[in-house]
A protein has these predicted regions:
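Hinge/lid segment of periplasmic solute-binding proteins
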Residues: 104-158, 176-179, 326, 331-340
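Glycine-centered hinge/linker elements that transmit conformational signals in sensory
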Residues: 181-182, 225-260, 342
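Extracytoplasmic/periplasmic substrate-recognition and gating elements
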Residues: 251-254, 293-392
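A structural signal for short loop-to-beta-strand junctions that line the ligand-binding cleft
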Residues: 87-89, 96-98, 128-166, 177, ...
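Short, solvent-exposed loop/beta-turn-alpha elements that line the ligand-binding surface or hinge
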Residues: 121-134, 198, 217-241, 294, ...
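Long, aromatic- and glycine/proline-rich binding clefts that accommodate carbohydrate-like moieties
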Residues: 334-341, 389-442
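Conserved C-terminal helix/tail region of periplasmic/extracytoplasmic solute-binding proteins
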Residues: 2, 399, 419-474
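Conserved N-terminal structural module of periplasmic/extracytoplasmic solute-binding proteins
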Residues: 2-108, 125, 454, 462-474
Length: 474
């Protein structure tokens, strides 16, 4: 998963006792065996969200009243390493694996491999309907494969346009306008960079997928096999338009000279250091800027001179404000930091922004299917989603939470986030997504070297090879 906003709001989870035993069963039984020992459902999540989901597990444990216990277990921080560890556990039939926090792009692969149980397998018969109730369309679509839900949305994410409000009275609505305004800043020797994710990695694929979807195109058809980058004149035009937009951003006058090596972290720093007038990034940007401004690291936002905010940095050196401090910091930051919808590729048509986030699925290796599904429903309950969003910095997947005043106070951009998630793009749904992503990022890099017509043909060829399972991955 891409750099998460959770790192700016994370709380430590309380570790459960090591004496708890894993859920056991007997080979002759179809259900989950009980003994005097406590049944434990292990929930594997990225290490970067350990505190957030450990806290969610503990809220559920209080609610469960001792019938069984949910234990959060950390996977590595990098998405590719998370996927590899889960795959090894699943192919090795590791019976300690019950619940999986899955990157939204893994659904098709895990479903095809039989690693994730369909939600319709819930013995209680409630999970499939519960996952769809009140769910935003984009996150829900990411949990579906071939018309069936194999996971439930747990958290989500969407990128916004962040801009220097003290320099830009009104945010640009299209990419043409964004590039033009950045070039105007270059001519006046102002901050002219458009900070985004340009190096050869998943972030570059996300950028391309958003621009492609916004232009009316797609990488694959709904069957997960048919490549649709250049198969019709309209699809080819959408692909070329997306590539032309990427090239114009990367080669604009005054563009970031290191754009071929940029990711979420470097984009954030470029903006905070005053080098960028615009930034494409996830909602963690808001808390990051307030934290670093209070520490004196943002030259155009000197919150370090505000004595009422000095206590907003906690003992761990992270942003841990009271409600009053958050409101004060946000009010001050709003003079310099603005947010707006992701710029349109086609004027008058809202961008379709690629979502991030996590889904939660029951692993085929669980010996306690009923308890695992019950745990899944508790972990993504409304109460847990609200706490995960407010305390963990991960946007909620239930649409009604965006009307909650407490949620709105912590997410000033809530209306834009909700609207983009309702009209979101998802990355290509395919069991071969990992190969597709690797090949696409290799073709797109370096972003400054894109030749729209030629690159469109190369992309089509490489994605077709990935789907066909041919050739070495670059």
């Amino acid at each position: 998963m891409l750099e998460s906003s959770a790192r700016w709001f994370r709380r430590k989870g309380v570790a459960l006792g090591s004496s708890l035993l894993t859920c056991l069963t007997l080979a002759s039984l179809t259900g989950c065996a009980r003994s005097d020992d406590q049944i434990v459902i292990r929930f594997y999540t990225p290490a970067s969200e350990a505190g957030t989901f450990s806290a969610a597990a503990q809220r559920c444990n209080r609610e469960l009243g001792g019938r069984f216990t949910i234990l959060q277990v950390s996977l590595p921080k990098r998405a590719d390493e998370q996927r590899l560890q889960l795959a090894r556990r699943l192919t090795g039939n590791d019976r300690t694996l019950d619940l999986m926090g899955m990157d939204v792009v893994w659904t098709a692969e895990f479903a095809e491999a039989g690693w994730a149980l369909p939600l319709s397998d819930d013995p209680a018969g409630v999970t499939e309907a519960a996952a769809q109730r009140d769910a935003l369309a984009g996150p829900l679509e990411s949990a579906r494969w071939k018309g069936k839900l194999y996971a439930a949305p747990l958290s989500t994410n969407t990128q916004l346009l962040w801009y220097r409000k003290d320099l830009v009275p009104e945010p640009p609505a299209t990419w043409d306008q964004t590039v033009r305004e950045a070039e105007n800043f270059a001519r006046s020797e102002g901050p002219s960079w458009i900070a985004l994710q340009g190096k050869q990695y998943e972030g570059l694929v996300v950028l391309f997928n958003t621009l492609l979807s916004s232009a009316g195109g797609s990488v694959l058809a709904g069957d997960g096999k048919t490549v649709t980058l250049t198969d019709t004149p309209a699809h080819r035009q959408a692909t070329v338009t997306a590539l032309r937009t990427m090239k114009s951003i990367a080669t604009a006058d005054g563009a970031d000279p290191s754009i071929t090596q940029t990711d979420e972290g470097t984009a954030r720093l470029a903006f905070e250091q005053g080098k960028a007038a615009f930034e494409i990034n996830w909602p963690f940007v808001m808390a990051s800027m307030m934290e670093n401004a209070i520490k004196g690291g943002v030259p155009f936002l000197r919150l370090d001179r505000r004595p009422d905010l000095t206590g907003a940095i906690g003992d761990a050196g992270r942003f841990a404000p009271s409600e009053e401090q958050f409101a004060a910091a946000y009010e001050a930051a709003s003079a310099a930091l603005g947010f707006a919808p992701f710029p349109s590729v086609v004027a008058g048509q809202p961008a379709r922004v690629t979502i991030g986030g996590l889904n939660i699925a029951v692993a085929k290796t669980t010996r306690c299917k009923a308890q695992a599904f019950e745990a899944l429903n508790c972990l993504r309950s409304r109460e847990n989603q609200k706490a995960t969003a407010i305390e963990g910095g991960l946007p909620a997947v239930d649409s009604s939470l965006y009307d909650d005043p407490e949620f709105q106070a912590k997410y000033p951009a809530y209306a834009i986030i909700r609207d983009q998630l309702a009209n979101a793009a998802v990355r290509p749904a395919s069991p071969y997504y990992q190969a597709i992503s690797t090949r696409v990022s290799a073709v797109l890099a370096p972003i400054t070297g894109i030749d729209p017509e030629r690159t469109a043909d190369l992309l089509n060829d490489q994605v077709q090879k990935a789907v066909d399972g041919r050739g070495l991955i670059p």
